[in-house]
Amino acid sequence: MHLSSRKRVFVSFDFDHDEDLKNLLVGQAKHPDTPFDLADWSIKEAISGNWEQKARSRIRSVDLVIGICGEWTHTARGVGIELRIAREERKPFFLLWGRADRNCQRPIGIEPTEKMYRWTWDNLRALVGGAR
């Protein structure tokens, strides 16, 4: 895929429980025909001071935000805040069901009607391409 047509993506995830899932997405981003580049991801630091300002700056610089949902995502305040910022900045986002064999949770502030998509290569490519 031509580099200029690839989307710049920010990945929002629960650092305490789902860093392995972010690493899987990093691996998929290296696939030769991937439609995206991982530009940035969640910041591992306390939510205080200028954390939100840093997150907003990172999210502003991308085309799309991917929220990875795991079993404890509803307890990760930062994920909910990052997705709220994505909305405020009018950045499209979608949620991936991070663990196929587990009960994954939406972040705080995300409506139960917001779909979590199965994490498959075909789904990921389609979702990055705008199929939602």
Each predicted region: which residue ranges?
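Short, well-ordered alpha-helix to beta-strand connector turns
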Residues: 62-63, 113
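Conserved N-terminal substructure of TIR/SEFIR domains
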Residues: 1-61, 99, 132
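Arginine/glycine-rich "motif VI" loop of SF2 helicases in the C-terminal RecA-like domain
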Residues: 30-34, 85-92
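A charged, well-structured terminal subsegment
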Residues: 125-132
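Conserved TIR/SEFIR loop-to-helix hotspot centered on a Trp-containing motif
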Residues: 71-89
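Short beta-alpha junction loops
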Residues: 93-103
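Glycine-rich, charge-decorated loop segments at or immediately adjacent to ligand/cofactor-binding or catalytic sites
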Residues: 101-115
